[in-house]
Amino acid sequence: MTMYVIKRSGRKEKLDINKIRIAIKFACEGLNVDPLELEADAQIQFRDGITTKEIQQLLIKTAAEKVSAERPDWTYTAARLLLYDLYKDVAHLRGYSLRDDLGKYKPYNRKNFYSFVKEYVEKGIYGEYLLENYSEEDFNKLANYIKPERDLYFTYTGIKILYDRYLVRDEEGRVIELPQEMYMLIAMTLAVPEKPEERLKWAKKFYDVLSEHKVTVATPTLMNARRPFTQLSSCFVLTVDDDLFDIFDNVKKAGMISKFAGGLGVYLGKIRATGAPIRKFKGASSGVIPVVKLINDTMTYVDQLGMRKGSASITLDIWHKDILDFLEVKTNVGDERKKAHDIHPAVSIPDLFMKRLKNREDWTLIDPYWARQYITRKIYDGKYKEVKPLPGSHYYVGIKEDGTQDILEPKGLEDFYGEEFEKWYLELEENLPSYAKKKVNSFELWKRLLTVAFETGEPYIFFRDEANRKNPNKHTGMVYSSNLCHEIVQTMSPSKHEKPVLDPETGEITYKKEAGDLPVCNLGSVNLGKVHTEEEIKEVLPLLVRMLDNVIEMNFYAIPEAEYTNKRYRAIGIGVSNYHYCLVKNGIKWESEEHLKFADKLFELIAFYALKGSLELAKERGRYKLFDGSNWSKGILFGRSVEEIEENSRQNGNNLPWRELAEEIKKYGIRNAYLLALMPTGSTSLILGATPSIDPIFARFYKEENMSGILPQVPPEVDRFYWHYKTAYTIDHEWTIRAAAVRQKWIDQAQSLNLFVDPQNIDGPRLSRLYELAWELGLKTIYYLRSRSAMDIEECEACSV
């Protein structure tokens, strides 16, 4: 009996086993796998009318199930089979043949690249800026530059995630582009700000580093560069003032940011505590928790077209009078009315608390409302007859002896760090009335914080004094908190509002607002599996700096404060992926002094060439607007003197010309106020087939369940380096913290530092020691405490690079 298969076009043809074998041969060629094994184990149950799609899916499934730590090459076989399927689907949709005029297999249609993009620009799926900035001739040149063979770099997990989440689809949900077309269109988008005569040159350079998997850009950039709405930034950090208008203005901002898939960090430390007065009515304030719940509910409501809930980290100071309730917002005990299960709590901790903790001394919780009243009056004491809050306003008013008034900027305890903070804290502790403060034992508070962290993985930790001491732009203000993933450390401030003014004739209402600093994360990362020598770093880092600077120009801004801050600071965040693989590839054990030396040498190179790239960009395009007065302008790099850095470089053996670089920076400036931030690289590491960010591997082989299904995970070259890969829950994480401290010397922002602890082999003192060591060694942040399966904690998709 003759059997027929149904092709994608709907046409019937005779079953030809040889065609299946050709597909299997293509998928297995050059790999350490047996094509006959795949053919036999697929056990295809042929029947009349079976579709070619069904046959292909069965082969993909069979190959994916064979992936293991001992036989990792099956991941490339499964990837090729999925690519083969994708090529056929896209060719059928776009109406071209997979064979050229000579019958040679050609998965990419170079001839019609321009007409393809033009069609989907007209349909509103690609952005008009592509046609506005590139001619048909440009498209043809770039189409011919595409390298289809680079598709073979993908693992099965990588291409599956790319297929499910990143490749652009039409209005019916069908994938319309191929991976190398995606990379080229992203490169073209990021090259739009370049001079027209140089645009193709930069598009090719950007394409090369992206498609060779040397770098990757943030999830929003991968998703939205080439689309009409170019929301390319990952995270945003809001500062909420103690004012009802500002609270709800920030709730609105949170909703708008979440609508366009941005992640959020929110600082609530300025808000008065429970029981504080409102307009002189005693005990009227409900405190911080209702605001936390407002943001929580906004994140769940603005669910990004039903795809996923928004994400927000909310930070409160450990001296805030509401801190005890705040620590419980995600626990399963206590009053459910005070819970906010969908936000990520973070705690800001000053040095003074850690000092008192060592001696088990008391700690005073303070209401920021009363602290602000006390400090503001004290600062202006002697200059005015009376200083009092201006009703309905952020400001205070100073009344002079002659009755004239000045508008005054208030200052709270949160507006100081280091010695100034300690001075004011001690004074408040001594002088505030009992209703404005509450005494607790520092150790008991710390113990509760760690217990909650052990149970839930959170709160994140923000060491505020170190963050502000090392802020290269401290001349512009304070850093109160970090972003959702706790790698961004930038100057921030609340916006200031004036009362709305009504025109009674027209009914027009005018709102005036002075924009504060709202940090924006423009992120990208370097794949250390492919880029770790000085020559490689020297080539790639300046390119990545340039790409991210162009993100700022191409970005769509959902809120004006974000654009204002982004254009003033031009902050970027360069991170890394494949760190663990880089170590094992170089024969370096995680728990070793060699690891620390390697990290020191490597991250000095990254820091130097990132700064060098930003310097060269400043020569070409101009320095960032707030450069004058910054540490960079004074020759202070990463919080250290040039002499100290030169000595460090000599010890590393790098001997880089830091003094020459510092002098050039003083003369020309740099383009970007902030440069380095080691973010998580969850989904984008999976696309690259890399180990995530700076984390150790979770296991040598496991299956991860996510939006793309159950996917096999193996680190790079696990068959070759099996015993070199030590897994996260078997590592002594004092080494992790020590390595992070070495890296931090070369990072102007922070690191998304996860700590992994085995519940069976950890106790309270040991856990406390890890956190205390992080503070002692000068870390700025701690991200998750992973005491459960890594798959149980939801990673921030927006920040993921």
Swiss-Prot record:
Active site: N483 (proton acceptor), C485 (cysteine radical intermediate), E487 (proton acceptor)
GO terms under cellular component: ribonucleoside-diphosphate reductase complex
Keyword Oxidoreductase: yes
Binding site for GDP: T219, N483, E487, G682, S683, T684
Reaction equations catalysed: a 2'-deoxyribonucleoside 5'-diphosphate + [thioredoxin]-disulfide + H2O = a ribonucleoside 5'-diphosphate + [thioredoxin]-dithiol
Gene Ontology terms: biological process: deoxyribonucleotide biosynthetic process
Subunit structure: Tetramer of two alpha and two beta subunits.
Protein name as catalogued: Ribonucleoside-diphosphate reductase subunit alpha
Gene designation per UniProt: nrdA
